[in-house]
Amino acid sequence: MHKRNGPQAPPGRGAVTARQLGLLVDFSPDGLMIPEDGVNDEELEAEFLALVGGQPQALEKLKGKGPLPMEAIEKMARLCMRDLDEDEEGTDEDVEADEDLLAELNEVLGEERKAVEPAMPVVQPKPSSPNPGIEATLQERLILYQSAVESARQAGDSAKMRRYDRGLKTLENLLVSAKKGNTINEADIPPPVASGKGPAIGHSHTHTTSHLAPVSPPAPEPSVTLEAPSTTAQTSAKPQLSPDPCSPLARLQSLQHEYKVAALRAKHQDDTATAARYLRVSKSFDPVLEALSRGELVDLSRLPPPPDQLSPEPPLPAAQPVTPASTLTRPEVPQPPKNLLEALEQRMERYHVAAAQAKAKGDQRKARMHERIVKQYQDAIRAHKAGRAVDVAELPVPPGFPPIQGLESAEPSQQSLVGVLETAMKLANHEEGSDEEEEETPKKNTPAASTAQPKASPSRAPPSGPAPAGKAASKGTSTRAQQQLAFLEGRKKQLLQAALRAKQKNDVEGAKMHLRQAKGLEPMLEASRNGLPVDIAKVPPAPVNKDDFVLVQRPGPGMSQEAVRRYGELTKLLRQQHEMCLNHSTQFTHLGNIAETIKFEKLAEDCKRSMDTLKQAFARSLPTPAARFEQRTFSVIKIFPDLSNNDMLLFIVKGINLPTPPGLSPSDLDAFVRFDFPYPNVEEAQKDKTSVIKSTDSPEFKEQFKLCINRGHRGFRRAIQTKGIKFEVVHKGGLFKTDRVLGTAQLKLDTLETACEVHEILEVLDGRRPTGGRLEVMVRIREPLTAQQLETTTERWLVIDHIPAAVPTVTGPKAKVPLIPASSKEAGNRSSRPLHSLSVLAFDQERLERKILALRQARRPVPPEVAQQYQDVVQRSQWQRAQLEQGGAALRREYASHLERQLHFYTEAARRLGYDGSREAAKEALYRRNLVESELQRLRR
């Protein structure tokens, strides 16, 4: 057809074109020259480098026939050798977990070390002269790669097979070029691989042990193999960095290499456990080598021995560099502090160390957090040194440190059912004593230090101060952490008591359940003792014993029916108070309010003690104990627990003076109410109606409707804020008459944001015109939508005076009262026995009775001094009453003046104790002063 006319191509042009197309491979330096024809187009070069991931700017300056730099050639070779599928298939974790690849890298590492040493004096590597040993080396590598390809094919590892196949093709090309007499650069020869056969192992061992002192510490990462040329260039540029063969760095590198070779040998012997052990030991050298390369000090006394001398036990970790951050990760709890300042300094130092550790690990966020806490402690220490009060409850507590005030030691945990039940028996028989018992008998293992008295003795020494000071120290549990611990211990005690009761009733399943709940509290108790916050909402509720508020004994024959009825009324009131306390305690527990929870727990315990007193008096056929009502004010949460979060109750109570249609009288009105709540939308609004109430204009419907809501739904919020509930008052029609709407009313529900109940009396409108009628409605939800509804209520609280279980017998107290003769009724002639306030004597008598009752309930003997005190108080009170009855007006005047002196004495004592900081003792003195003042006023009237 058409012939191509043009100059004939010069001879040899076809071979050049074939080389450019990649058909002929020429590794000579002349073959790497960039020709000046169209192949050297900058656009093609940029496109090629963009495809292989390079930077086009690196080759823009290369013009003419100058050779490419070796760095660019090596980079292009590495990019071409990289397998994209392999990068996608495996991850760093898979590569590191592949023991075959690690062994291969170790052999490569040994071969590179051999190649680095002769290249150190030169600046740029030059092609070596023809060497007859190159062909033998290529033949050996060819056999190794053929075996490796076959092994990878049998193992089904496609990534390794492709990698070895590329190396095999490169070796074949190099071998052909070597046979033609071309110069072969040793750096172009693929490295040896682990073929899994004996000769290959011995060969690699001879190569890897030829050099043990590389310039930089090798790491078992695949990137080391790729960066070997740059490492060689850096080494040749700075030969003075080579370590001394006898230096610690060379010694560690040699020992690490021995462990790697031993791991490879153990792996090929199918001893994977030993291979993994040697590999772990070799990896433990990496941080030490890095520390030595940075010039840090290293303790080499704990280095593991060579592999052949390693004991069968797990090896010790390699020595760590001596740096400021090399501290124990798990700090020990320091000695108990002597004062508040030392406690603050200990905790500040712990957070300072934690900040240093976080910085050393590179965790800047945690380091900044610990530094902020250190600043808080520094401010607290400065405030304490300046004499200002320090709120230690606001300071974070380090893990493992108890709160600064100290906590009671934990009871030993019981591991068996019998042991737990024995502990529960002891706890059930042991009741808390009164406050006065705490004054005289200090608790064991209770610290005496408090924030108000930082210079008090530590918890190891028992308090030796007066009774009020001991009481104040024992009540230093005002912090949240201590309240939390006391609450958890009390709940565990209640659960153990419930388990004991269930076991006594042969309810094994119930006993096991309560024991499991008690054991489940131990992690919370441990965390609370260490100063960590716990979620008390997850604490199981207190078990309730129904028999606690039941009079099980029968009354004696001498008890009247009126007394039995009064006992029943008191029991009912105490049961109601106890249930109310438990309900409020549960609500505050779910909210995490530990202070209010403990408050209602104590009130519930008081109700139980009052019930115990009532039971004892009932069993002994005594008259009802002295009972009184007190006004108690509580802050409670208003909630309707019988409703779920998705329920809303609508109450239509009644209508008041509803309008009547024209021509009908109010007695002819048959009314009902229908409502419309536009949620979830107007089309699917919730609608219903009441029943018809006939013949009245003030019907009482008293009906309730349960509506479905979603508290978090935006449509529900929009419905209660803008729409509400629409009501229609309707007159029921007759047989051929339709229903007639008398008026409408609208209830707004925006109050539910902050309240759980809306109670309104709505005005019935005819359009916009008032009709004079009213409609009473009410809406309830479980709890408010945005915040808790706190209410302050005042209750009439029943308090029963405690009586001792077994009062020490006072033989003939009236016989010991000396009768006052007639002549002694005058002032100054009475007995020399001192007078005391009868109210104060009654207070002391009641206090001693409570103490004796507590001892009896705990099945402990009454101390003789306590019994003697009680007997003395009873005798003094009876004697003084007889004196006042027989003494006349003169003795009463003297008694009044004596009360005035006691009033002044207690006033001064309360003021002095308040200045001294003894708050509890000052409160007691003030209470006695009020008793004397009340008695003096009654006496004057």
From Swiss-Prot:
What PANTHER family does the annotation carry? COILED-COIL AND C2 DOMAIN-CONTAINING PROTEIN 1-LIKE (PTHR13076), COILED-COIL AND C2 DOMAIN-CONTAINING PROTEIN 1A (PTHR13076:SF8)
Task: Indicate where the modification Phosphothreonine is found in the sequence.
Answer: T91
Q: Which GO terms describe its biological process?
A: apical dendrite arborization; dendrite arborization; endosome organization; negative regulation of snRNA transcription by RNA polymerase II; negative regulation of transcription by RNA polymerase II; regulation of postsynapse assembly; regulation of respiratory gaseous exchange; regulation of respiratory gaseous exchange by nervous system process
**Quick check: keyword Metal-binding in the entry?**
no
Location of Phosphoserine modifications: S247, S434
Gene Ontology cellular-component terms for this entry are:
cytoskeleton; cytosol; endosome membrane; glutamatergic synapse; nucleus; synapse
Keywords, sorted A to Z: Coiled coil, Cytoplasm, Cytoskeleton, DNA-binding, Nucleus, Phosphoprotein, Repressor, Transcription, Transcription regulation
Q: Which ranges carry the C2 domain? A: 628-762
> What InterPro entries has UniProt attached to this entry?
C2_dom, C2_domain_sf, C2_Freud, CC2D1A/B, CC2D1A/B_DM14
Task: State the name under which the record lists this protein.
Answer: Coiled-coil and C2 domain-containing protein 1A
- Please give the function described in this protein's UniProt entry: Transcription factor that binds specifically to the DRE (dual repressor element) and represses 5-HT1A gene transcription though this element. Mediates HDAC-independent repression of HTR1A promoter. CAMK2G inhibits CC2D1a-induced repression of the HTR1A. May play a role in the altered regulation of 5-HT1A receptors associated with anxiety and major depression. Performs essential function in controlling functional maturation of synapses.
Q: Where in the cell is it found?
A: Cytoplasm; Nucleus; Cytoplasm, Cytoskeleton, Microtubule organizing center, Centrosome
Q: Where is this region: Disordered?
A: 183-248, 301-336, 428-482
- Tell me the lineage of the source organism: Eukaryota, Metazoa, Chordata, Craniata, Vertebrata
Q: Would I find Mitochondrion among this entry's keywords?
A: no
**Compositionally biased residues, Pro residues:** 303-318
**Pfam families assigned:** C2, CC2D1A-B_DM14
GO molecular function term, any single one: DNA-binding transcription factor activity, RNA polymerase II-specific
Record field: compositional bias (Low complexity): 467-476
